[in-house]
């Protein structure tokens, strides 16, 4: 375990690290293409699909690849759920400033995602933007039906975010309570990432 990564994670709420090699990227890109014959519209997390068989296939296949890829990176953890997140071109793919849903008791643990693009993220295709250290601002409880406490300050908060540009297969490992957003994808291609939630074993 890289203690330097752990220290930066606790301070900033995120770290970046290599995750997938070319073989894994080809397998994941192929999986996405097979399951998505039609172009996705807007912002599409596979988690929100109403098709349980589709969700199960995505979860199983991504986790199988990611479990091998995280050996030596994570210690005593278990991958719980995996998904694709697709950001299509255009303004309807913008994801506003937010924090992810609360999935663990954050008074004792950190809920953590491994977010990894299948192609490089840039200023043109909606790279993830964060406020380092914002996971330590205020303890919050978050859910899909709970209004975010920062909703009235979105424009001010967005101005304080910084982009995190990643290579294909390079992961951003982040605390689910960190403030983040992703701007418009101005390219002609859908930007696809894998997102994996994990906990202590």
What are these model-derived regions, one by one?
Residues 1-97, 102-106:
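Non-heme Fe(II)-dependent double-stranded beta-helix
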Residues 3, 36, 171, 178-201:
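Non-heme Fe(II)/2-oxoglutarate
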Residues 14-16, 113-117, 161-163, 171-173, ...:
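Conserved hydrophobic/aromatic beta-strand scaffold that supports enzyme active sites
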Residues 75, 98-111, 159-160, 166, ...:
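A short beta-loop-beta micro-motif enriched in histidine and acidic residues
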Residues 83, 99, 116-120, 132, ...:
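Short, structured patches in soluble enzyme cores that scaffold and shape functional sites
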Residues 88-92, 120-124, 136, 171, ...:
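Short, charged/polar surface micro-motifs in flexible loops or helix N-caps
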Residues 105-123, 197-200:
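Short, conserved beta-strand element in jelly-roll/cupin
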Residues 123-183:
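Double-stranded beta-helix
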